[in-house]
């Protein structure tokens, strides 16, 4: 049987978890096997910016950061389950990637 590997990425931890919960509910309703959600390492992007606009004075910096949270879910590729997965409303800032594997 084929498996579907679902990779979720997003900057908001709560939104990523709600999408994971919806996928888990679909798997329970359809009765397919589910592995995950497996938390992947969080990527932390840091951008230091100099506070002073002219370069004079003390070297003080602002540090801006963005964290990208990732989850991995393996689910059996049942036709009914995949149709329901396609109907999930995913927020705009959440990336979802589905790969079918045999």
From Swiss-Prot:
Q: Which biological process annotations from GO are given for this protein?
A: translation
Query: Which keywords label this protein?
Result: Ribonucleoprotein, Ribosomal protein
Which domain of life does the protein's organism represent?
A: Archaea
Entry's InterPro entries?
Answer: Ribosomal_uS10, Ribosomal_uS10_CS, Ribosomal_uS10_dom, Ribosomal_uS10_dom_sf, Ribosomal_uS10_euk/arc
**Record's Gene Ontology CC terms?**
small ribosomal subunit
Give this protein's Gene Ontology molecular function annotations: structural constituent of ribosome; tRNA binding
Q: Which PROSITE patterns match?
A: RIBOSOMAL_S10 (PS00361)
Cite the Pfam families for this sequence.
Ribosomal_S10
SMART domains for this protein = Ribosomal_S10
The entry describes its oligomerization and partners as: Part of the 30S ribosomal subunit.
Q: Which family does it belong to?
A: Belongs to the universal ribosomal protein uS10 family.
Chain's role:
Involved in the binding of tRNA to the ribosomes.
Q: What is this protein called?
A: Small ribosomal subunit protein uS10
- The organism is Methanoregula boonei (strain DSM 21154 / JCM 14090 / 6A8)
């Amino acid at each position: 049987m084929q498996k579907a590997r679902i990779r979720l990425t997003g900057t908001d931890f709560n939104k990523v978890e709600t999408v994971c919960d919806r996928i888990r509910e679909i798997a329970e309703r359809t009765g397919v096997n589910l592995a995950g959600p497996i938390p992947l390492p969080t990527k932390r992007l840091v951008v230091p910016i100099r506070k002073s606009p002219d370069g004079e004075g003390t070297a003080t910096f602002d540090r801006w950061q963005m964290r990208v949270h990732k989850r991995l879910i393996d689910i059996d590729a049942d036709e009914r389950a995949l149709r329901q997965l396609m109907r999930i409303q995913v927020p705009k800032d959440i990336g979802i990637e589905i790969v079918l594997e045999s």
